[in-house]
Amino acid sequence: MLYQTIQKKTTDNEGNPKPIGAQVGLGVKVAAISTEFEQGELTHTEGDFDFAIQGNGFFMIQMPDGSTAYTRNGHFTMAVNGTGYQLSTAEGYAVLDSEGNPITFDGTTDVTKLSFDNYGRIMLRGADNNPHLTGVTIGAAQFNNPAGLNKIGDSYFQATAASGDARIEGQDTALSRSVIKNKYLEASSVQAVDEMVDMIVTQRAYEMNSKAITASDEMLQQANNLRS
């Protein structure tokens, strides 16, 4: 809310006391836009490289300029690169492992035999038909203040001084590790019914304020007519 203070003195010109701090409202402005990182419902998919995070983690993504971005959107694909395969986002950006390196496989790897445990550790089914750890883990990072992340579009965020530096799960022993579920995606945490109710309440408040302004204008007009 924007206000203008029109009374700053405690007495009038004749020395009589009067209340201070009288303000006139001038309207409203946007103070901040915040992002809610509440856990969304997990939806099962048929995508072999779809992932959903249960917990506070963010997937780590390498952007075209070499910087690291963070996202909760785990809709990934296995893309073909010059020497083999690379786990990538839908936009073609590389998904990073827990060491901050792109997750790649050479051309001899049968990527249909890959599997993943609940911590994002990547396994490859061997000749014995059993999964074996590859030593690579899908990277997940947490932040002391996720609300301080900078939104850069397409569900991507960048770390800022307000968010703090990324804390890598599996390296920072003080963190509670997130669960990374394969063949699931996280749905929006927005409750459509609640948002509709809030919108109706806001609309009603706007209508009431509009009517109050109209009534005030009519009263002033009547006062002007009485003077004339």
What are these regions (language model features)?
Residues 1-228:
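Amphipathic alpha-helical polymerization modules
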